[in-house]
Amino acid sequence: MARYIGPKAKLSRREGTDLFLKSARRSLADKCKLDSKPGQHGRISGARTSDYGTQLREKQKVKRIYGVLERQFRRYFAEADRRKGNTGETLLQLLESRLDNVVYRMGFGSTRAEARQLVSHKAITVNGIVANIPSQQVKAGDVVAIREKAKKQARIVEALSLAEQGGMPSWVAVDAKKFEGTFKQVPERADIAGDINESLIVELYSR
């Protein structure tokens, strides 16, 4: 399955909620109507969605939020299921600990896709070592930074400025002047923003 490269707003409309796939420079609600599905007949309501359909939609939504493909997502779920604790919460923690997501949460990229590109283009270091694998798991205490040669990129400066205005998660500490941040701890469920019902995903894979 190839990575989706079409209109990002269309995906958010399909899920009926902002998936934060677009930059925060302009509210997605100003760009499109989230309460109507994409397409000519988007306003027409269909038949009642089955339990399976609801669970599948939730999985698709989370995959799109984090930019993860099906095979990767299955691996994350298997790992979450293997660990002790709440499987759904652990799944989200694994996704939040991805390097591309941490770069996004620290404000170095205006979207996860942009953050993923920064990682792939070797603009990011973890503990002083260049990292270019977006799925790399970041651990508590790791220092994530922008490489010197990338610090003057306008998109990074602008993204960081917007992130500072909007506030950053409590589980990261960012020094904007140094273009670096510390992953303080794996976020608790209450710290993970987003309209996500992870229990539906657990139910789907438990079938």
From Swiss-Prot:
Entry keyword annotation includes Transport: no
Domain S4 RNA-binding: 97-160
Protein family according to the UniProt entry: Belongs to the universal ribosomal protein uS4 family.
Annotated function: One of the primary rRNA binding proteins, it binds directly to 16S rRNA where it nucleates assembly of the body of the 30S subunit.
Subunit structure: Part of the 30S ribosomal subunit. Contacts protein S5. The interaction surface between S4 and S5 is involved in control of translational fidelity.
GO cellular component: small ribosomal subunit
Keyword annotations: Ribonucleoprotein, Ribosomal protein, RNA-binding, rRNA-binding
Domain of life where this protein originates: Bacteria
UniProt-listed GO biological process terms: ribosomal small subunit biogenesis; translation
UniProt-listed NCBIfam families: PRK05327.1 (NF003717), rpsD_bact (TIGR01017)
CDD domains membership: S4
GO molecular function, one term: rRNA binding
PANTHER family, alphabetized: 30S 40S RIBOSOMAL PROTEIN (PTHR11831), SMALL RIBOSOMAL SUBUNIT PROTEIN US4M (PTHR11831:SF4)
SMART domains recorded: Ribosomal_S4 (SM01390), S4 (SM00363)
Protein name: Small ribosomal subunit protein uS4
InterPro entries linked to this entry: Ribosomal_uS4 (IPR022801), Ribosomal_uS4_bac-type (IPR005709), Ribosomal_uS4_CS (IPR018079), Ribosomal_uS4_N (IPR001912), S4_RNA-bd (IPR002942), S4_RNA-bd_sf (IPR036986)
